[in-house]
């Protein structure tokens, strides 16, 4: 599995692109699991580790009983605090004692690889607003730890994307940073006019209506090919 980095402003369709690609990929491979993580509101390592563990277990478990069993069986030194809501369709919430995590971060960072190897799966971890890790306490040390683990994973790939270009560029293109050349770097552009016109035609058709080409082109021009406003 290869690693991919995507950079573009908010509202340009990164998440939609990743979700669509994930859906198509899983339709072709029954052994593939996609884990989605959003770091928009994550401001420290403690929250990151809990969220990573929770999302990985959710993505690799078909029901909450399996999620609870995975949460217990794949940790040797950490004792996860498991919370189950009244709705069994919701994810199992996982938390740890922060002092234990600081002593044993490997167990969380290698969790996806362990599960993938044990269950014969391939896992892709998609992390939105990845540049937020640059705001953690001692970010370079944290990034070194992430890179040292993630680069060794054989059954897990990473799709890391974000909207703050200068911060993402600093993380991935600065040769002194741990994530330098971690994966294939992509810059997402605005959608070309013909594709947006086709999109308008399709959406109008879905509701039993139609739109002429000139009107569709005018809308594209007015929103400056911006995917969010085009919707």
Question: What residue ranges belong to the model's regions?
Answer:
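The conserved phosphate-sensing helix
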Residues: 223-231
């Amino acid at each position: 599995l290869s690693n991919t980095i995507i950079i573009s402003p908010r509202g340009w369709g990164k998440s939609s692109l990743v979700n669509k690609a994930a859906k198509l990929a899983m339709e072709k491979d029954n052994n593939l699991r996609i884990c989605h993580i959003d770091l928009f509101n994550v401001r420290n390592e403690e929250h990151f580790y809990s969220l990573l563990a929770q999302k990985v277990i959710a993505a690799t478990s078909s029901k909450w009983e399996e999620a609870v069993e995975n949460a217990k069986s794949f940790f040797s030194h950490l004792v996860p605090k498991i919370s189950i809501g009244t709705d069994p369709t919701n994810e199992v919430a996982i938390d740890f004692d922060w002092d234990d995590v600081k002593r044993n971060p490997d167990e969380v960072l290698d969790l996806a690889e362990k599960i993938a190897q044990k269950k014969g799966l391939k896992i892709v971890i998609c992390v939105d607003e990845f540049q937020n890790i640059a705001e953690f306490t001692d970010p370079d040390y944290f990034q070194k730890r992430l890179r040292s683990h993630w680069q060794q994973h054989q059954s897990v790939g990473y799709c890391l994307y974000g909207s703050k270009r200068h911060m993402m560029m600093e993380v991935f293109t600065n040769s002194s940073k741990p994530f330098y050349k971690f994966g294939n770097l992509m810059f997402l552009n605005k959608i070309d006019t013909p594709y947006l016109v086709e999109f308008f035609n399709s959406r109008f058709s879905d509701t039993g209506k139609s739109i002429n080409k000139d009107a569709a082109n005018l809308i594209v021009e007015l929103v400056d090919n911006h995917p969010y406003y085009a919707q």
